[in-house]
């Protein structure tokens, strides 16, 4: 019974992240929604790992790797956003067409 609740929560988080990623106009908000999507995938990995084989930690270890990749993605993404803000004075996605210049 607990697995269903966690999976439903994960689907809700994934849906909120996708909706936010599609409708977001701000780069920082888009990065936050992308991290929300990755965290919902981590919840699924840990839940299915515990559901199918509770003695092995394959899903948990893979989840740690996904968290490390998400941290690197956030650091690089925020560095790019701060660089764009320094040059363009805006973090809006529709105002930062870098191919024009």
Curated annotation (Swiss-Prot):
It catalyses: a plastoquinone + NADH + (n+1) H(+)(in) = a plastoquinol + NAD(+) + n H(+)(out); a plastoquinone + NADPH + (n+1) H(+)(in) = a plastoquinol + NADP(+) + n H(+)(out). Keywords: Chloroplast, Membrane, NAD, NADP, Plastid, Plastoquinone, Quinone, Thylakoid, Translocase, Transmembrane, Transmembrane helix, Transport. GO terms for molecular function: oxidoreductase activity, acting on NAD(P)H, quinone or similar compound as acceptor; quinone binding. Its EC number is 7.1.1.-. GO terms for cellular component: chloroplast thylakoid membrane; NADH dehydrogenase complex. GO terms for biological process: ATP synthesis coupled electron transport; photosynthesis, light reaction. It holds the Pfam family Oxidored_q2. The chain crosses the membrane at residues 2-22, 61-81. It is an enzyme of class 7 (translocase). Disulfide bonds: none annotated. It is found in: Plastid, Chloroplast thylakoid membrane. HAMAP family: NDH1_NuoK. NDH shuttles electrons from NAD(P)H:plastoquinone, via FMN and iron-sulfur (Fe-S) centers, to quinones in the photosynthetic chain and possibly in a chloroplast respiratory chain. The immediate electron acceptor for the enzyme in this species is believed to be plastoquinone. Couples the redox reaction to proton translocation, and thus conserves the redox energy in a proton gradient. Belongs to the complex I subunit 4L family. NDH is composed of at least 16 different subunits, 5 of which are encoded in the nucleus. This is NAD(P)H-quinone oxidoreductase subunit 4L, chloroplastic. The lineage of its organism: Eukaryota, Viridiplantae, Streptophyta, Embryophyta, Tracheophyta.
């Amino acid at each position: 019974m607990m697995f269903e609740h966690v999976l439903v929560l994960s689907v809700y988080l994934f849906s909120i992240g996708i909706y936010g990623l599609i409708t977001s106009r701000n780069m920082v908000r888009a990065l936050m929604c992308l991290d929300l999507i990755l965290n919902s995938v981590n919840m699924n990995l840990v839940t299915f790992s515990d559901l199918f084989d509770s003695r092995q930690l394959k899903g948990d270890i893979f989840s740690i790797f996904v968290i490390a990749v998400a941290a690197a993605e956030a650091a690089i993404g925020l560095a790019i956003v701060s660089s764009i803000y320094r040059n363009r004075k805006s973090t809006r996605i529709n105002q930062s067409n870098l191919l024009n210049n």
